[in-house]
From Swiss-Prot:
<dbReference type="InterPro" id="IPR004401">
    <property type="entry name" value="YbaB/EbfC"/>
</dbReference>
<dbReference type="InterPro" id="IPR036894">
    <property type="entry name" value="YbaB-like_sf"/>
</dbReference>
<dbReference type="GO" id="GO:0005829">
    <property type="term" value="C:cytosol"/>
</dbReference>
<comment type="function">
    <text>Binds to DNA and alters its conformation. May be involved in regulation of gene expression, nucleoid organization and DNA protection.</text>
</comment>
<dbReference type="GO" id="GO:0003677">
    <property type="term" value="F:DNA binding"/>
</dbReference>
<dbReference type="Pfam" id="PF02575">
    <property type="entry name" value="YbaB_DNA_bd"/>
</dbReference>
<keyword id="KW-0963">Cytoplasm</keyword>
<comment type="similarity">
    <text>Belongs to the YbaB/EbfC family.</text>
</comment>
<dbReference type="GO" id="GO:0043590">
    <property type="term" value="C:bacterial nucleoid"/>
</dbReference>
<comment type="subunit">
    <text>Homodimer.</text>
</comment>
<keyword id="KW-0238">DNA-binding</keyword>
<protein>
    <recommendedName>
        <fullName>Nucleoid-associated protein tlr0723</fullName>
    </recommendedName>
</protein>
Length: 115
């Protein structure tokens, strides 16, 4: 074996490996912070012009449901439909927020295949 050839893992490869490890650590730290941020968020979905509201976290954890007293006389089926619509709205907003934040995280790190 000629001098400097070793196992094909020279100084250049070591620098690449160190950079890859550093990026992986950045992704891990960023993902942890993102998870914490998403858990703290309150994202609101609405139906009936805001008469029914569903609030969930950025990780789609339900927090609360608010129903205008004016709707209580509408009956169970109508209320059920409105709550379901508000839940869908909140879920869509929450998943869109999560997706956007993930794209921001991975895009800023320039990790191939993630951004």
């Amino acid at each position: 074996m000629a001098q400097g050839q070793g196992f094909g893992f020279g100084l250049g490869k070591m620098k690449e490996l160190a950079a890859a490890i550093q990026k992986a650590q950045q992704v891990q730290e960023g993902a942890k912070k993102l998870q914490e941020d998403l858990e703290r968020m309150d994202i609101e979905g609405q139906a009936a012009g805001g008469a029914v509201k569903v609030i969930m976290s950025g990780t789609q954890e339900p927090r609360r449901v608010e129903i205008s007293p004016d709707l209580l006389s509408e009956g169970a089926e109508v209320l059920s439909d409105l709550v379901t619509a508000a839940m869908r709205d909140a879920y869509q907003k929450s998943t869109a927020t999560m997706r956007e934040r993930m794209e921001e995280l991975t895009g800023s790190l320039n990790v191939p295949g993630l951004g």
